[in-house]
Amino acid sequence: MLRAFAARSCAARGFSRPAAGLLRAPSLRLLSADAQRRGTYEAPTEEKQLAKLQPRIAELYRKGRYKEALAVGEECHALALAAFGKQHPAVASMCNNLALMHKSLGDTDAAAALYKEALDCYRVVVGEEHASTATAACNLALLIRDTDAARLQEAQALLEGALQTRRVLLGEGHLTVAATMGHLASVVKLDGADGRERAKVLLEQALAASTVHWAKPGESAEADLQRASLLHSTGLLHKEAGELSAAEEAWAQAAEIRLGWLGEKHPLSAASQRDLQALREMMGGAE
């Protein structure tokens, strides 16, 4: 998941390490070959303002000041429209960032509309099989998953397409591919017994890839924390199937990883510890 400033998260880039979910705008300039060669390009006023404002959105988002970030994002969106017109990657990036702010503020209807606008724009200007399109599809799919159970098939289709694109662009063993498999598993598991079985396979494949392709445990926070996320999802699947011992094993591993990298006060570490403790109490009561 302002990743178009970036990722995963949420992808295109406005600062070196964008905040999760933020998409940084792609290169904004559309230079003639002659202007590039002679170095005579002068960015329009809107583009200069946009370049200055983008980092501010990320800063406000990281601080949880979503209303202020939304206001700056709306200004950026207007500047991008004025500079490039409606069908441009920079405009799609701004739509993604506005959607994230609305989502953070609890306005999921506005967020869904903006995520859809970003996705439609990317499909037109960069094509279906592009990294930014895959990111936009994931953003919309995850919002649908969390807010509209009647549209789970749509969410699944979006994630299937994003996974296919990312496999081609990044390779089977990439962290982002594994994350997408985890997202897809979280949707397909809701589709009865067959869906749960497919979710299990997806998570097993992602964890197997982590063993072969990723940094060894303890060497990379990014890899380890993605592994912890997959383990937590695996444990939840086992718990829902009544396989409590398997759930405990997966959750214990996830909790240990998160504690080691994030510390006990981090929300993810605390949540893992609470879930694991509650599960063990449940298992004790069942004995």
Which residues fall in each region the model found?
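Intrinsic-disorder-linked linear interaction elements in eukaryotic regulatory proteins
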Residues: 1-287
